Structures are given as C-alpha cells and as structure tokens.
Amino acid sequence: MANLRKLGRRTDHRTAMLRNLVQSLFENGKIETTVTRAKEARREAEKMITLGKKGDLSARREALKYIYKKDVVYTLFEEIAPVYADRQGGYTRILKLGPRRGDGTEMCILELVDYTKKESSEEKETVKADK
C-alpha cells in the first residue's frame, strides 16, 4: 500500500486500531479522534460502505473479515449503506475541533454524512424506565 501512515505503531497494532475506529464509527455514527487517525479510518470506512452498497454475499464476507462484530456488519448493510445508495463516495466528514489539552494534538470528529442513528427498542425502553 502506498502512502500509508504508520501512526507510530507496528502493523498489527495499527490495523487493529483502525478496525476498532471504523467499527465504533458504524456503531455510533461519529467518533472523536486525532486528525491523522481520522484520515486513515476514513479510507477504510469508505471502502466498507462501498461494500455495503454492493450488498451481495461476497461483499458481506469481505466486511466480516475487517469488522469484528456481526451486528455491526448487519447495521452497515441494512441501515447505513442504503442511505448512500445514490452517493458516489464522500460518505464521511471530518470536523476539526482544535488542539487536545494534554499534548496539543489536533483533534476532530469523524462522522457519517446524512446518517442519523436509529434508536433500538431496547434503548427506548431504558430511557422510559429511567424517567
């Protein structure tokens, strides 16, 4: 792979970190991270959404190779990818927040464009029970 950022980690640690970032992005709709990590995670997230748009069995198996949780792959294929059916790339956006207080690293929010996370019935019940 050309132009790969090493992010100060060994290959296995770097790939695991990026997989976790992408998985968290699909679970929550947005994540807060450093700008360089967000740029690398964005590359992988865009590839996964493109696989989700294909929607066939081989694409689902490719996504399962990269994403750890099966329910996140289901969410990707059934909820996230259909939102971007008519969009040709540019599924994510990076919003810069400014420097982190501890070390001054530039922070940002990586989020999915035009996607609002659906609340599951279990989450709604817990919110009602708390009130």
From Swiss-Prot:
Molecular function GO labels: structural constituent of ribosome
GO BP of this protein: translation
Disulfide bonds: none
SUPFAM superfamilies, A to Z: Prokaryotic ribosomal protein L17
Similarity annotation: Belongs to the bacterial ribosomal protein bL17 family.
Cross-referenced HAMAP family: Ribosomal_bL17 (MF_01368)
PANTHER family with a match to the protein in the record: LARGE RIBOSOMAL SUBUNIT PROTEIN BL17M (PTHR14413:SF16), RIBOSOMAL PROTEIN L17 (PTHR14413)
Subunit structure: Part of the 50S ribosomal subunit. Contacts protein L32.
Protein name, entry field: Large ribosomal subunit protein bL17
Originating species: Finegoldia magna (strain ATCC 29328 / DSM 20472 / WAL 2508)
Name of the gene encoding the protein in the UniProt record: rplQ
